[in-house]
Amino acid sequence: MIAEIHGGHGVGCPVCSGPMKHCFSAQVLCKYQADYEVCDQCGYLRAHDPHWLNEAYTSAIAAADTGLVMRNLAVASKLAGVLYWVLGERGKGIYLDAAGGYGMLTRLMRDFGFDFYWADKYCNNQLVPGFEYKPQQGPCNAVTAIEVFEHLTDPAAFIKETLEFSGARTLIFTTELYVGDPPEPESWWYYAFATGQHIGFFQRRTLETLGKKLGLHVSSANGIHIFSDRRIDESILRIVTGRWVSRAAPWWVRRRLGSKTFSDHELMLQKIG
């Protein structure tokens, strides 16, 4: 199974085991005082003892997340180019969207022509019923984890267990990185104090520390981050995930791989019948 997204916190940094130091306090869920601490060694920043998580996850998707659809569209367009031009997908591989929420990204990627599947232990599959991933299907070429890392208490465990579950050696994910000192509480929207669901934050060096710990290479460009056992040219990744290429990628890829929209529709009708 995929690792727990939220759970208990240890004393030291879960990324590098270094000491954590207090950096600021803020109110979460409009009622709980939370302390935030940072690791000077790797830059990992987290909420200390997030005891409010059960309350924060009464709904897996926060009601205030009005940008969910637009972000999925943007990420799917970038992923189409990454899978086709960077990983060389030509229609034979299978993919998993871990912690896939309602299934929106999986549906979009199948519409583009990729054989994508879904898994999420905290959310119901609303949009791609019948396309839940099972290890018996065989190893995935890659696994995605979109907007997951900021919810984790132990990112290393999540990476390891997700790759083991999927059989993949490449994990493509998104999370907003910060640069330099931890941003002031009032200056960074990504803390998302009102929802209480974002509890861990990363720098580029945090990702590099995780990669070294797990024996994986790290690549990052335009908000797309990759852990992989293969080296990925960041200059190519930057081009493929850039504005102009990512806008054209869905159209290009769909024409070459063939959309699964209608074939999935027919499959669902067969199951109903």
Q: Language-model features: where?
A:
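Conserved N-terminal segment of class I S-adenosyl-L-methionine
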Residues: M1-A142, I146, A156-F165, S187, ...
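Residues lining the SAM
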Residues: I146-F149, T174
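Di-metal (Zn2+ and/or Mg2+/Mn2+) metal-binding site signature of metallo-dependent hydrolases
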Residues: H151-P155
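Short glycine-dipeptide loop
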Residues: S166-L171
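Short, glycine-/aromatic-enriched active-site segment of Class I SAM-dependent methyltransferases
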Residues: T174-G200, R205-T206, L210-K212
